[in-house]
């Protein structure tokens, strides 16, 4: 199957990196290779791109798509390990990092992966197929309190309690094994009058996917480690797709811009912690109306950029 994916905020993201022809860059989420391709076009033979993805399908597809470029290194891993990856490649510092945190169109459209609430598929949702924890285990083995917590915290779902109750009740009769089975349970749990805005299963599926792939735990560490490996003037550009991710990135960038831990009423800083980055855009960059009409999946995307100082 072709790895179809339209990269969002492509021009804005690439422009934000201020790419140097001989620079070293990291695409932490290779996907269909859209961002990587645009970076490679701007690099000379002396430049280098490290392309990371935990989905081997993305690696295989992009290796074919980008086969004419010789200055790209593919890494089948999670960008959580960015520091170790760079260490093993004997790369001390890089000039730019991209993280596109969205699920690719390929992963949504490929029925077998279980990411989509629009297609029937086994409950899976693993970005890395070698991982042991899948959506099936979460839905069928987590207790009601655990389910409620992840649906509430990761999905920001107002009906997390009802949904978790309905899931537990349904699985007492037989295991919940497919995506559309789960969708049916969620629809029963949410009162009809509250199902008018967006798909009723969207937030719960988001929550389960985040739990399966440990996305928020990965994100916090990866941003910190990524920034630590930037050259002075190097930039990190991060595209988020839901408010929870965006708040984490906004908060992380603020902390890196002002890491001082001194009490607010202290006249001078005595903790010695200096700013690590400067935030390039105080407000996130969002897609144009034109992009949203061409690619509806870009609607919720936001781009935040920070520069190492």
Curated annotation (Swiss-Prot):
Molecular function GO labels: rRNA (cytosine-N4-)-methyltransferase activity
EC number: 2.1.1.199
InterPro entries in the cross-refs: RsmH (IPR002903), SAM-dep_MeTrfase_MraW_recog (IPR023397), SAM-dependent_MTases_sf (IPR029063)
Pfam family, one: Methyltransf_5
Recorded superkingdom: Bacteria
Coiled coil: none
Residues that span the membrane, as ranges: none
Positions annotated to bind S-adenosyl-L-methionine: 33-35, 53, 79, 100, 107
Keywords: Cytoplasm, Methyltransferase, rRNA processing, S-adenosyl-L-methionine, Transferase
GO cellular component, one term: cytoplasm
GO biological process, one term: rRNA base methylation
Subcellular location per the Swiss-Prot or TrEMBL entry: Cytoplasm
Reaction catalyzed: cytidine(1402) in 16S rRNA + S-adenosyl-L-methionine = N(4)-methylcytidine(1402) in 16S rRNA + S-adenosyl-L-homocysteine + H(+)
Family: Belongs to the methyltransferase superfamily. RsmH family.
Entry function: Specifically methylates the N4 position of cytidine in position 1402 (C1402) of 16S rRNA.
HAMAP family membership: 16SrRNA_methyltr_H (MF_01007)
Protein name in the entry: Ribosomal RNA small subunit methyltransferase H
Organism: Clostridium kluyveri (strain NBRC 12016)
């Amino acid at each position: 199957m072709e790895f179809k994916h339209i990269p969002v905020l492509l021009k804005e993201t690439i422009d934000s990196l201020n790419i140097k022809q001989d620079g070293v860059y990291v695409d932490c989420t290779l996907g269909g290779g859209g961002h990587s391709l645009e970076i490679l076009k701007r690099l000379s033979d002396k430049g280098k791109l490290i392309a990371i993805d935990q989905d081997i399908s993305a690696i295989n597809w992009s290796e074919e798509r980008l086969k004419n470029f010789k200055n790209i290194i593919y890494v089948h891993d999670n960008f959580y390990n960015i520091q170790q990856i760079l260490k093993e490649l004997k790369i001390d510092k890089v000039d730019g990092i991209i993280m596109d945190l969205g699920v690719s169109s390929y992963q949504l459209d490929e029925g077998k992966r279980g990411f989509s609430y629009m297609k029937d598929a086994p409950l899976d949702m693993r970005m890395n197929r070698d991982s042991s924890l899948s959506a099936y285990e979460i839905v069928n083995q987590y207790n009601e309190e655990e389910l409620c917590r992840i649906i509430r915290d990761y999905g920001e779902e107002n009906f997390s309690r009802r949904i978790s109750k309905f899931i537990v009740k349904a699985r007492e009769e037989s295991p919940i094994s497919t995506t559309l089975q789960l969708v049916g349970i969620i629809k029963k749990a949410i009162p009809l009058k509250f199902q008018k805005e967006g798909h009723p299963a969207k937030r719960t599926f988001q929550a389960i996917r985040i739990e399966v792939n440990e996305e928020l735990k990965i994100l916090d560490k990866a941003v910190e480690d990524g920034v630590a490996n930037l050259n002075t003037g190097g930039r990190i550009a991060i595209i988020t797709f839901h408010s929870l991710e965006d708040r984490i990135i906004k908060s992380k960038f603020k902390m890196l811009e002002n890491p001082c831990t001194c009490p607010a009423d202290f006249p001078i800083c005595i903790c010695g912690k200096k700013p690590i980055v400067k935030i390039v855009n105080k407000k996130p960059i969002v897609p144009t109306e034109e992009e949203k009409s061409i690619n509806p999946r870009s609607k919720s995307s936001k781009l935040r950029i920070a520069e190492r100082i």
